[in-house]
Amino acid sequence: MLRFTEDHEWLRLEGDVATVGITRHAAEQLGDLVFVDLPKVGTTLSKGAAAAVVESVKAASDVYAPLDGEVTEANDAVVAAPETVNQDPEGAGWLYRMRLADPSSLDALMDEAAYAALPK
């Protein structure tokens, strides 16, 4: 089940661990990514705080923590090959995984239909 934020991040929950990335819309708006900076494993994130940075030839953009939690894994493959985020933003282009402080907080995020209806 995918959930989305108004800042164009997505989450996929498996148990109490969420995989986080940017949406296809965000990747298209940024253009070709040339640099990705991810949070370190063990970092505690607060909802709305800058968690990662994605940089394209057009702009650099913060990726915000969608919920409170602790980083359990960073996708080093996208650091080595940032274009993966453009090619498969909601798959192989995921950014990091985090253990949610409160998995029920996921309910506050948008489902796919609500995200699709969001003005872009």
Swiss-Prot record:
**What keywords is this UniProt entry annotated with?**
Lipoyl
Which BP terms in the Gene Ontology apply to this protein? glycine decarboxylation via glycine cleavage system
Q: Which residues carry this modification: N6-lipoyllysine?
A: K58
Q: Which InterPro entries match?
A: 2-oxoA_DH_lipoyl-BS, Biotin_lipoyl, GCV_H, GCV_H/Fam206, GCV_H_sub, Single_hybrid_motif
Tell me the cofactor note: Binds 1 lipoyl cofactor covalently.
Q: Name one GO cellular component term.
A: cytosol
Q: Which CDD domains match?
A: GCS_H (cd06848)
TM helices/strands, residue ranges: none
Cofactor needs: (R)-lipoate
How it assembles, according to the record, is: The glycine cleavage system is composed of four proteins: P, T, L and H.
NCBIfam families per UniProt = gcvH, PRK01202.1
What is this protein's function per UniProt? The glycine cleavage system catalyzes the degradation of glycine. The H protein shuttles the methylamine group of glycine from the P protein to the T protein.
Name of the protein in its database record: Glycine cleavage system H protein
The organism's lineage? Bacteria, Pseudomonadati, Pseudomonadota, Alphaproteobacteria, Hyphomicrobiales
